[in-house]
Amino acid sequence: PELVEMKAQVYKDPRPKEHFDRFHERTRTKGADWMYEVVRMVLTPILFVIFRARCIASDNVPQEGPVIIAPNHFSFMDHFFVAVFVRRRVHFMAKSQLFTRPIQFIYTHGGVFPVRRGHDDQEAFITAHTVLAKGGTIVMYCEGGRSRSGDLAPKPKRGIGKLALESGATIVPVAIYGSAKVRNWKRLQFPKVTVQYGEALRYEQVPDPDKGQQQEVANEIFGEIKRLYAGLEEHGRRGMAQKVRAAR
């Protein structure tokens, strides 16, 4: 079926940097709280029953230490598809336009922090580094925003490479397959979604990587995501699960 057209996007948030300081401060000092578990409890039946979400190799996500989970991005539901199979509480970068009353309360207490869209937002990286320095987990999309076409982007943004090199954190590439059609829910079309967690990647820490280094690492991470995605496309959920089990 054809994809429902996404709403027109605003690619630059006009609100000043200072508007978002309190959201960053909360994530840096307190992080996700009881709201994370409430959202998880409410959404888990929807993910498992309506979207038949299942995972492959979620144990590739380390149970401790700083971790960056790096998925592709098709849907507003991708946060939840990725996090529901991970036992740790994860923190998410999300576009700043989402931070409006009253929903921003759920975001800030649920582990979400803003990236000021259309700006070189260093505050978002400071927040991410703060979470990682405490041994936390960050979800960061390689492509930046959601794909409007339903296909993987031609190339990743270099931000994932920047964070990987500066932090030295473990990277877990993730392929989310099927979520491009989640936007068709208004037509009562509910796709089957598969989330495959790849083998962990690690890079030597580089305090101040140049743009070329950032892009090179981003390309490597995204290359692994594309490999996982292509496997799901060719072999399906069951086929890839069998391949992973056979390789262990």
Task: Tell what function each PLM region has.
Residues 1-35, 123-248:
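Non-catalytic C-terminal accessory region of glycerolipid acyltransferases
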Residues 7-63, 88, 101-110:
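A transmembrane-helix-recognition feature enriched in membrane-embedded lipid enzymes
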Residues 43, 82, 104, 128, ...:
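Short amphipathic alpha-helical segments and helix-helix/interface helices
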Residues 48, 63-120, 127:
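Catalytic core of membrane glycerolipid acyltransferases/transacylases, capturing the structured
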Residues 53-58, 77-79, 99, 125-127, ...:
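A generic local structural motif
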Residues 55, 92, 112-114, 171, ...:
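Conserved beta-strand scaffold positions in the cores of enzyme catalytic domains, especially
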Residues 56-58, 95, 115-117, 198, ...:
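Conserved beta-strand termini and adjacent loop/short-helix elements that scaffold enzyme active sites
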Residues 59, 120, 177:
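Residue-level "edge-of-site" marker
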